[in-house]
C-alpha cells in the first residue's frame, strides 16, 4: 500500500474526500482498568463513577461497536491488574480471561502487572490471546523472554498498523524482587528506534504507541515522548489516570501534531478514535 496521511475526523480537521480514496479505522482503548470486574458501587462518593464500569458494560459496548465495525482495533495501555478481591485471589487470571472474551488486539505493561512477580506475569501473558508489547524493558534471561515483544504488526483492509508499548521506570514503583533481571531503557530512545523500524523497515502505514508513562512530567511522560520523537502517529496513554474529554495534540520533532488520548481509570470510559487514511 502506498504512503498515507492520517486524519482525525473527530476534530474535523480534514476536508471532504471521495469514499473510494479513504480507509477508515476505528480504535478503542482502555487503561488502568485495575481489576474493575464489577460495577463501581452506587455509594461511591464520586458521582461520575458511582454505579458505572464493570466487565458486562464494557463487553456489551465493545460487542455492539464490533457488530457495526468488524475491523475495529482494541488496545489496553497497562495496569489491568490490582484493585479488587478478584485480583488478590486469582492474581490476574480473571482479568486476562475477560480481556480475551472482549477480543483485545494488543496490550502493554503497567507497573501493577509486576505485583505478584515475573513468574505470575509470564503465566498471565501466556494465557492472553493477544500480544503484550513493550519496547523499553529488556527481558532477556527472564521468564518473560520470548513472551513480551517490542512491537506487533496488525493489518486491517490492507492497512499495516505497527503497535508498540512503553512502560515506566520500575524503581520506586515495584518491589525490586518482583522485576529482577528486567532492564529499563529510556522510553524516548526505545520509541525512536522502534518507530523508525516500523515506518522504514516494516513499511507500516500507521504507528501506534501504547504508553504507560503518564500524561505529564519529567523525564518521561507522553508529553516528553512526543516532543522528542518522530514516526509515531498516535499515542494512547495510561498510568496517570488522566481523563481527556477531547483528543489532545502535541508537536513532535518534525512539527507534526500527534494525537494523545487517555481514559481515566477503572474502565468507566472506553476511548474511541476514528482515523481516516488517504492514499498518497
Where are these regions (language model features)?
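C-terminal segment of classical bacterial N-terminal signal peptides
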Residues: 13-19
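Acidic, metal/ion-coordinating pockets
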Residues: 19-280
Amino acid at each position: 500500500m502506498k504512503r498515507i496521511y492520517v486524519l482525525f475526523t473527530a476534530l474535523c480537521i480534514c476536508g471532504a474526500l471521495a469514499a473510494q480514496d479513504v480507509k477508515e479505522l476505528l480504535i478503542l482503548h482502555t487503561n488502568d482498568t485495575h481489576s474493575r470486574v464489577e460495577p463501581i458501587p452506587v455509594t461511591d462518593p464520586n458521582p461520575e463513577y458511582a454505579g458505572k464500569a464493570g466487565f458486562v458494560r464494557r463487553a456489551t459496548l465493545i460487542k455492539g461497536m464490533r457488530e457495526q465495525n468488524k475491523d475495529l482495533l482494541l488496545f489496553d495501555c497497562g495496569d489491568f491488574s490490582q484493585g479488587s478481591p478478584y485480583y488478590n485471589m486469582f492474581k490476574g487470571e480473571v482479568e486476562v480471561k475477560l480481556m480475551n472474551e472482549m477480543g483485545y488486539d494488543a496490550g502493554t505493561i503497567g507497573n501493577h502487572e509486576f505485583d505478584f512477580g515475573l513468574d505470575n506475569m509470564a503465566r498471565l501473558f501466556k494465557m492472553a490471546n493477544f500480544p503484550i508489547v513493550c519496547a523499553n524493558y529488556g527481558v532477556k534471561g527472564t521468564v518473560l523472554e520470548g513472551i513480551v515483544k517490542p512491537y506487533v504488526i496488525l493489518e486491517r483492509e490492507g492497512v499495516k498498523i505497527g503497535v508498540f508499548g512503553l512502560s515506566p521506570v520500575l524503581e520506586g514503583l515495584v518491589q525490586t524482587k518482583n522485576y529482577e533481571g528486567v532492564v529499563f531503557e529510556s522510553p524516548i530512545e526505545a520509541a525512536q528506534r522502534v518507530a523508525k523500524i516500523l515506518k522504514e523497515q516494516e513499511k507500516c502505514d500507521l504507528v501506534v504507541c501504547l504508553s504507560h508513562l503518564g500524561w505529564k512530567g519529567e523525564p518521561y511522560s507522553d508529553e516528553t515522548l512526543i516532543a522528542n520523537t518522530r514516526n509515531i502517529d498516535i499515542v494512547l496513554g495510561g498510568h496517570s489516570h488522566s481523563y481527556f474529554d477531547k483528543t489532545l495534540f502535541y508537536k513532535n520533532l518534525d512539527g507534526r501534531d500527534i494525537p494523545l488520548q487517555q481514559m481515566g481509570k477503572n474502565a468507566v470510559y472506553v476511548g474511541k478514535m476514528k482515523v481516516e487514511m488517504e492514499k498518497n
